[in-house]
UniProtKB/Swiss-Prot annotation:
Its EC number is 7.3.2.1. Residues 8-248 form the ABC transporter domain. It catalyses: phosphate(out) + ATP + H2O = ADP + 2 phosphate(in) + H(+). This is Phosphate import ATP-binding protein PstB. GO terms for molecular function: ATP binding; ATP hydrolysis activity; ATPase-coupled phosphate ion transmembrane transporter activity. Keywords: ATP-binding, Cell membrane, Membrane, Nucleotide-binding, Phosphate transport, Translocase, Transport.
Amino acid sequence: MSDKKTKIQVRDLDLFYASNHALKKINIDIKENEVTALIGPSGCGKSTFLRTLNRMNDLIPIVRIEGEIQVDGKDIYKDDDVIALRTKVGMVFQKPNLFPMSIYDNVAYGPRVHGIKDKKVLDKIVEESLRDAAIWDEVKNRLKSSALGLSGGQQQRICIARAIAMNPEIILMDEPTSALDPISTLKVEELIRKLEDKYTIVIVTHNMQQAARISDKTAFFLNGELVEFSDTNTIFTNPRDKRTEDYITGRFG
C-alpha cells in the first residue's frame, strides 16, 4: 500500500447533463506525486470526470453535480474561489492551445494576470517552467519568436510549461499526446514521468500502452461508472473485474 498522502478524495460523485446520468457514484482517492491514468472507451465518462476536478464543467449550464470532491481535505464545490482552484489545479488539453504571441509571453501570461510585473521574477518563472517542461534548450534562443511557429510536440510542451508557470500542485491532462507523432509523444511521456516528483498528475488516455508506460495507478471507466481502480500493473496483468479484462484485451472498446 502507498504511504503517500491522499491529494484528491472523491466521494459518491454523480454528474448529470440535464437528465443524462453521466457519472454514477464515483469514489476514488488519488495520491500525491503519482500519475493516475483514466482509461475506458469513448463516452465512458473519463474526460467528464477529469473536468470535475477543476470545475471546468461549471461552464456548461445543464450540468448538475452531487457528491463531494476534496483537494487537500477541502470541498472544492463548497468554495466560491474557482480562480484559486484552477491556479492550484492546472490543465493541459488534447490539442496545443497556445496564444498568438511569443513563447515567453505564453508562459508568462498566467503570472502576469495574477499581478506579477517584475521582469526578473517573470524571467525566472519562464526559465524554470520551460526547464521543468524539458524544452528550455530548444527555445532559449528564440523566446521572443511566435510560439505558433513550433512543432506540435514543442507546442504541447509549451502548454505544459504554461500550466507549470502558475505553480500548481495538480496537473490534469486530457489526452495530451493524441494529436502528436510518436517521437513527440515519447518526449511528453518522459516529461510526465519526471513531473510527478513535483506534481500530482491525472491523465486521460485512449492509449492503453501509454497508461501502462507512464502511470502508477489506473482507473477504468465504463458507462459512467468507475469499474476498477488499482496499481497500473495489477490492472493490466491481473484485473479483478471481467469488464476490465475484456477492455484491456481488446474484446470491446
